[in-house]
Amino acid sequence: MDDTEGNSSMDSIRNGQSSPLPQVTPRLPQIPMMMRETPLSTKRERQAITPRFRRPAPKMIKTMPPTRSIWSVRKESVPLLVTPQGPKPLESPKYDHTNAQSFFEQVFQIDEIIGRGSFGEVFAARCREDSQLYAVKVSLAPIRQHSISKYREAESHMIIPPHKNLVKFYRAWEETGRLYIQTELCDQSLLKYCTEKHALPEDEIWNIFVDLLQAVHHLHSNDMIHDDIKPENIFLTKDMICKLGDFGLVINLKNPNDVKSAEEGDSKYLAPEVLNGRPTKSSDIFSLGMTILEATTDLDVPSNGDSWHQIRNGQIPDRFFAGISTDLRSLIALMLDSDPRIRPTSRDLLDHPVIKKKLMKRGTYVKCISILNGFFYAFSAVLVWVMAFFSVLFHPIVRFHAAIKDRQSEICAQFVNNQQHTPIQTPETSKVYLESLTGVAVRQASQIVSPFDFSDDENPPNAQRRLFTGAVPCRLNFDNDQDDDEEQATCSSSNSSAIEPQLDEPESPPRMNDVIDKLGKRGTPRSARRNLTFNRHRQVAASVAPKSSLNHYNHHTGSGDGFSNNSLIPISDQERTEKYLRMRLTEQQLDWADQNNVIDEAPPPMSCPPRIRRSIRDLPRMPVLNFNVLDEPSNKPTVDHHTILEQSESPRRRLNRGAKPVPRNRMMSFGSSGDEV
């Protein structure tokens, strides 16, 4: 291979290829010159150079999977409260021993999972006892009954005195072989906060440094070692107050068992002397320095390798400290010293002049926040108490007022029910309609009716108007009391009626015998007989009067309630039945004729089209009103509107009008009205 080929291959390795070959691991893009000096990099730079591919999934191994959720295994046990004196039965007004659910499920309302690790899961849950949000940590692995560190974390929380920069502990209990720890709920972790912002302002770094230093000093003053200080175990409240939590690896120097069973924390923040020995207070200072270094420089802290030793040897490039003050950089260098004897203690750091100044400023801020929070909580408690007091005070008055309103509604309903009047456009599903005479007659009489109504009413698009039989047959007599012009009263769900002409005889109209046979099996509707025999006391007086006077009375008197004028004449049951049958037959013939003239298009909304009215109904057009005629002289020749209407009629209408006119009765019933022509 010649030199040109060798140089091209070396350049491709140094600069990287723009498009990697298939089936080949993609190479990293070109690394900046500042990063060639050291393998250390920031988190943002690491995200930019990380290859965007995933390794293949490992092969499936048919073994028993580990328990990864608290819901997978459940044992029947009684919840035990963990106390310094030993476990005790746990009681709560929200807990029912007979319920199959656990104490955690009954007393808490689980909102979400906010953390998950090798030890367990952390839930954000609202307690039903006080309606406050808490963080509940649940162990995944069942607790070993004879283990020395069975309640180690819970006991550490109870031994350590409360501090403003430590996560507040409430209680811990054991149930179904698992440990539950209830603590206060913070807004977010420091790891999440730094990952979102990458580079934090120096003022925020000083505040975090001062808060954590006070928490570590509080632990060291009580002979406790945290042994797991890292951004993941540091939490921020909504007021940006930093708190140290997760006491799972806390070592009590007063307890020999804790010293013997001490475990190593996260290797990223581990002091070098812990690899060959045990954790000490100086190792906590080193972990605190690594946490402040990561928050200040956004450094991607390595967990092993040469970079891990490079940081512990103090070989950190200056480019990571760009824009950082000398005081903060010198303090970080002191805490990261490889010799634990040279590292300052928490007391030495608090006595530093710069930290003293920052501590005084931070203390003022924390006191103001605590005062405001206390005032807010007190005001909330008073407000809740006042609301509860007024609720109890005015509750009887509100109930009394509601009872009065209900009684008023009942009285109004009784007054309306006493009125024997069915309103216009009453739906058939109405209780008032079903109990009325019309509703009873409609349910009892199964008469074939026309499915269409071509009245000038508001109709929904593509909807059919259903007609139903009226309760009482009525008629308008225009001759010498003949029965040929009798017609059964029908009504529709509209507020207008129309006089329809009787069309020619249909091709196959219903026969009288069929109607008689149909009615003979069922009989005359009881409501019709009751309506036709209305006002018996007046019928007795009418039977004595001469027939001519009755006819005269019928011709010139009309009742607006839908009753027949001739109903006052006493007739026998047989005559009444025959008249009723003739009326039904006449209406069926008319409906049959209407069905033969159905037009296959639905009337538009709001009104019936004029062309449908002109082609179906034999009604004269509405004349155009000209009000100027009233102002003109009266000697003008009068216009015969009937002649104009006859001339403008279509040939089909003239043909229909040439037939023998058959008088039609009005279509009327209770609650409806018609326009006379």
From Swiss-Prot:
Q: Where is the active site?
A: 228 (proton acceptor)
Q: Where is the composition biased (Polar residues)?
A: 1-22, 489-499
Q: Where do the Protein kinase domain residues begin and end?
A: 108-355
Q: Which residues bind Mg(2+)?
A: 233, 246
Cite the EC number: 2.7.11.1
Report keywords, A-Z. ATP-binding, Cell cycle, Cytoplasm, Developmental protein, Differentiation, Golgi apparatus, Kinase, Magnesium, Membrane, Metal-binding, Nucleotide-binding, Oogenesis, Serine/threonine-protein kinase, Spermatogenesis, Transferase
The record's InterPro entries line, in alphabetical order, gives: CC_SR_Kinase, Kinase-like_dom_sf, Prot_kinase_dom, Protein_kinase_ATP_BS, Ser/Thr_kinase_AS
This entry's Gene Ontology molecular function terms read:
ATP binding; cyclin-dependent protein serine/threonine kinase inhibitor activity; metal ion binding; protein kinase activity; protein serine kinase activity; protein serine/threonine kinase activity
List the effects observed when the gene is inactivated. Worms exhibit oocytes that mature prematurely (also known as the Emo phenotype) and chromosomes that appear condensed. Subcellular defects include irregular perinuclear foci in oocytes. RNAi-mediated knockdown results in an accumulation of damaged, compressed, polyploid oocytes in the uterus. RNAi-mediated knockdown in a double oma-1 and oma-2 knockout background allows for the progression of meiosis beyond the prophase stage and oocyte maturation, but these oocytes cannot be fertilized.
Entry's Pfam families? Pkinase (PF00069)
GO BP annotations listed: embryo development ending in birth or egg hatching; meiotic cell cycle; meiotic nuclear membrane disassembly; negative regulation of G2/M transition of mitotic cell cycle; negative regulation of G2/MI transition of meiotic cell cycle; negative regulation of meiotic cell cycle process involved in oocyte maturation; negative regulation of ovulation; nematode larval development
What role does this protein play?
A: Acts as a negative regulator of entry into mitosis (G2 to M transition) by phosphorylation of the CDK1 kinase during oocyte maturation. Required for oocyte maturation, embryonic development, germline proliferation and initiation of meiosis during spermatogenesis. Required for chromosome structure during mitosis and negative regulation of nuclear envelope breakdown.
Protein name according to UniProt: Membrane-associated tyrosine- and threonine-specific cdc2-inhibitory kinase wee-1.3
Native organism is: Caenorhabditis elegans
